[in-house]
């Protein structure tokens, strides 16, 4: 439900997969296009928004993806002056209409795992997992941040299959120089949260110039194979 566009693009650029400009598709608050967290908020009930969603989901299905991360969904929960569907008057109604359309597209053909990020806790029925906090990296303070969120939000596993602690970075781009201890803490953080999604470059022939693929492999073989942590998970 986001458009990461500049203001001038709203009036001249067409939403992909539709015949509508960005200005036509976004909600208005006090008569002006509304933004949240730097992105314009799409009207979940607008046909242009729905056509855009249909196009994106079906493209990903054709490419063979089975996992789909849906970020900044909270932009679809912003109260507008009005909606394209005049029977809808609240942000929750609009969100439900837009996400119901999204799920109808996801349900066509092979199933997909839907991971929600920066998403309202409720309504909860549209995702398999939900990010328990915001972006979380590999330093010890980040693990503390994520575990604090788990301590306060553990009960959401009654609604979602998985509480997502974010991707678990061991080395990443190697800019932060995480220690093995920080790596162990972060992987344990993922295990107790209930979802482990590793995110490093493990290539045997890495030519990206980013991170340290050899170190990532060494750390992964040592830390991700920790029997005690894996049994707990």
Label the predicted regions:
Residues 1-6, 42:
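Short intrinsically disordered, low-complexity coil segments enriched in acidic
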Residues 204-233:
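Non-catalytic C-terminal accessory modules of carbohydrate-active enzymes
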Residues 62, 66, 160, 198, ...:
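Intrinsically disordered or highly flexible coil/loop and linker segments, enriched in small
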Residues 78-93:
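Active-site cleft segment of glycoside hydrolase catalytic domains centered on the general acid/base Glu
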Residues 4-10, 73-75, 117-121:
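Active-site beta-loop-alpha junctions enriched in small/polar residues
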């Amino acid at each position: 439900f986001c458009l990461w566009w500049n203001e001038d693009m709203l009036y001249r650029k067409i939403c992909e997969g539709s015949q509508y400009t960005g200005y036509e598709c976004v909600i208005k608050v006090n008569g002006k296009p509304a933004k949240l967290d730097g992105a314009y908020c799409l009207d979940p009930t607008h046909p242009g928004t729905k056509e855009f969603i249909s196009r994106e989901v079906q493209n990903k299905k054709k490419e063979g993806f089975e996992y789909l991360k849906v970020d900044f969904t909270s932009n679809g929960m912003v109260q507008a002056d009005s909606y394209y569907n005049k029977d809808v008057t609240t942000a929750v109604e609009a969100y439900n209409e837009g996400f119901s359309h999204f799920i109808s597209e996801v349900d066509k053909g092979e199933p997909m795992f839907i991971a929600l990020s920066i998403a309202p806790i409720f309504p909860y029925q549209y995702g398999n997992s939900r990010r328990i906090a915001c972006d979380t990296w590999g330093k010890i303070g980040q693990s503390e941040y994520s575990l604090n969120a788990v301590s306060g939000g553990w009960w959401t596993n009654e609604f979602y299959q998985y509480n997502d602690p974010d991707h678990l970075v061991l080395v990443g781009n190697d800019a932060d120089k995480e220690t093995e201890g920080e790596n162990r803490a972060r992987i344990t953080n993922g295990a107790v949260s209930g979802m482990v999604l590793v995110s490093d470059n493990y290539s045997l022939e890495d030519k990206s110039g980013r991170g340290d693929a050899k170190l990532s492999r060494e750390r992964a073989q040592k830390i991700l194979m920790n029997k005690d942590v894996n049994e707990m998970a």
